């Protein structure tokens, strides 16, 4: 049974994919109430209230995936998640329309003084001259960050007859033309816009993006909107600009500290403030819960997730193409690790053929994960394999090869240790499956699975016969045997597979055979 803890309030309709599944148990409790059973959950679903910290990861020892029902993941320690091998997903599309509409409602309210006029009328006043506003038509809207939400806002602004100037370092001219916006530098947006709205994540680069210095570059009378993340606008700088008259008004849905207590900015008469309502519509709450539920269900079935924060994103079709190589990469990593009983400094991976056009970083991490699992006593998977390798002083690299091996696709790995190097080449052949086709320069062909024995020996008469006799005397049936050599009478290798694991005494007997150099036991899934 795959156990899911839902620690924040979510739409039950959105959770239906999990509720209806016959192999998933869903528990709706906050973290404190679930304290005694935290170690039993495979998945955790949160909104913004639950803080997913190092301490929580340490308690949730079975945790494999965290789903954030929303876009922002500020409340989740992504580095700790990665370190613990936990995938973090979000719902990047679920609240796009809701947030875009809220942003535009804030813009309209700010331009027409709607909240202030509403309070005035309810106070039995009728002061029309005090609330003369400005039209949106003909104004320039500056958008900082043209992601999904920014694009929806641009579309609505154009419908109001506004000119839209956008700063986004990843915006191409082609996309700008398609959306109908003007691509500008950040400074150009500051200088030209009548209204500026920010739609970026909160990062080291965007924290305080609109500060005393940058606000001073804006038009006098500019209006500023933040429905993205608290901290993108420096609140102290904004308050100063409102008080000196440079900024004509601000609409804020997010704050540096939430809820904002004793906040002079919130109290300012030219500020419209809402309590982080961007995603607070019935439709958005249903959408984000449904999106993360579907993703967690996919994960529980062993299928790829589309919105992982700390893994490469890929579609089902892309995953279908990559899956065979992902599986064999983990196996060859494990094979090398079990054969090299020495400290390792470097893992170099090479891709050849059409596989090189796929998301090779995912395959690389699968290989690293397979390599590290026999060597460490902590959780290792594709999420944290790179970090675990670096912690242990193991460098890794990947490159694309243009050489011809005779196979449509190949993965090769060269592992460098204190005393030796080890190389393996593998491929996947449709209808025939996974194959190891080279080990340490020896051509060979075998299916990497189950109980294996890798033998290095001299190519002399009788070695194979003596190996067979020892195994037969111990009632061991050989499932498959492959041999490889470079030249007659020189070094050779033998790879055998069995239906069960070999006992140590049999390995010792094999090791004592004349002309056998080494015997390595390998167990693969």
Swiss-Prot record:
Name listed for the protein in its UniProt record: D-3-phosphoglycerate dehydrogenase
CDD domains for this protein: ACT_3PGDH-xct, PGDH_4
Active site: 229, 258, 276 (proton donor)
PANTHER family according to UniProt: FORMATE DEHYDROGENASE 1 (PTHR42938), HYDROXYPYRUVATE REDUCTASE (PTHR42938:SF47)
Protein's pathway: Amino-acid biosynthesis; L-serine biosynthesis; L-serine from 3-phospho-D-glycerate: step 1/3
Record GO biological process: L-serine biosynthetic process
Protein family membership: Belongs to the D-isomer specific 2-hydroxyacid dehydrogenase family.
Claim: Magnesium is one of the keywords in the record: no
Transmembrane segments: none
Enzyme class: oxidoreductase
NCBIfam families to which the protein is assigned, alphabetical: PGDH
Catalytic activity: (2R)-3-phosphoglycerate + NAD(+) = 3-phosphooxypyruvate + NADH + H(+); (R)-2-hydroxyglutarate + NAD(+) = 2-oxoglutarate + NADH + H(+)
Binding-site residues for NAD(+), renumbered to this chain: 148-149, 168, 200, 227-229, 253, 276-279
Residue ranges of every copy of the ACT domain listed in the record: 452-524
Enzyme Commission designation: 1.1.1.95, 1.1.1.399
Keyword vocabulary terms for this entry: Amino-acid biosynthesis, NAD, Oxidoreductase, Serine biosynthesis
Species assigned in the record: Bacillus subtilis (strain 168)
A GO molecular-function descriptor: NAD binding
């Amino acid at each position: 049974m795959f156990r899911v803890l839902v620690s924040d309030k979510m739409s039950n309709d959105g959770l239906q994919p999990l509720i209806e599944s016959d192999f998933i148990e869903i528990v709706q409790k906050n973290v404190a109430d679930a304290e005694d059973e935290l170690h039993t959950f495979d998945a955790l679903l949160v909104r913004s209230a639950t803080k997913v910290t190092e301490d929580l990861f340490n308690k949730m020892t079975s945790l494999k995936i965290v789903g954030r029902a929303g876009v922002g993941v500020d409340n989740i320690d992504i580095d700790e998640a990665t370190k613990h091998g936990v995938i973090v997903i979000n719902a990047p599309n679920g609240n796009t329309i809701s947030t875009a509409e809220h942003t535009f409602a804030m813009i309209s309210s700010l331009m027409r003084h709607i909240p202030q006029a509403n309070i005035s009328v309810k106070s039995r006043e009728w002061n029309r001259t005090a609330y003369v506003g400005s039209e949106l038509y003909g104004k320039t809207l500056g958008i900082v960050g043209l992601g999904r939400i920014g694009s929806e806002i641009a579309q609505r602004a154009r419908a109001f007859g506004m000119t839209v100037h956008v700063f986004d370092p990843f915006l191409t001219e082609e996309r700008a033309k398609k959306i109908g916006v003007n691509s500008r530098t950040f400074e150009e947006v500051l200088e030209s816009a009548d209204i500026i709205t920010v739609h970026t994540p909160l990062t080291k680069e965007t924290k305080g993006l609109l500060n005393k210095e940058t606000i001073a570059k804006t038009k006098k009378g500019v209006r500023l909107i933040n429905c993205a993340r608290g901290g993108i606008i420096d609140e102290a700088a904004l308050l100063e600009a409102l008080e000196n008259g440079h900024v004509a008004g601000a609409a804020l849905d997010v704050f540096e500290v939430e809820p904002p207590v004793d906040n002079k900015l919130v109290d300012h008469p030219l500020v419209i403030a809402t309590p982080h309502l961007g995603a607070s519509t019935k439709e958005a709450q249903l959408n984000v819960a449904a999106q993360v539920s579907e993703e967690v269900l996919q994960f529980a079935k062993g299928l790829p997730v589309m919105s992982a924060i700390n893994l490469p994103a890929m579609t089902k079709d892309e995953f279908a193409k990559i899956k065979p190589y992902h599986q064999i990469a983990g196996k060859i990593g494990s094979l090398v690790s079990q054969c090299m009983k020495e400290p390792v400094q470097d893992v170099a991976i090479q891709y050849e053929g059409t596989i090189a056009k796929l998301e090779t970083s995912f395959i690389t991490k699968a290989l690293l994960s397979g390599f590290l699992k026999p060597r460490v006593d902590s959780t290792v998977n594709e999420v944290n394999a790179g970090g675990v390798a670096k912690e242990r002083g193991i460098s890794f690299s990947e490159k694309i090869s243009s050489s011809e091996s005779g196979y449509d696709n190949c993965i090769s790995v060269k592992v460098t240790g204190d005393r030796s190097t080890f190389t393996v080449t593998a491929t996947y052949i449709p209808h025939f499956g996974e194959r190891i086709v080279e080990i340490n320069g020896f051509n060979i062909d075998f299916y990497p699975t189950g109980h294996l024995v890798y033998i290095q020996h001299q190519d002399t008469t009788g070695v194979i016969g003596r190996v067979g006799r020892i195994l037969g005397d111990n009632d061991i049936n050989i499932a498959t045997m492959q041999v490889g050599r470079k030249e007659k009478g020189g070094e050779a290798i033998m790879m055998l597979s069995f239906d069960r694991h070999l006992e140590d005494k049999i390995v010792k007997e094999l090791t004592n055979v004349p002309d056998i150099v080494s015997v390595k036991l390998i167990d693969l899934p």
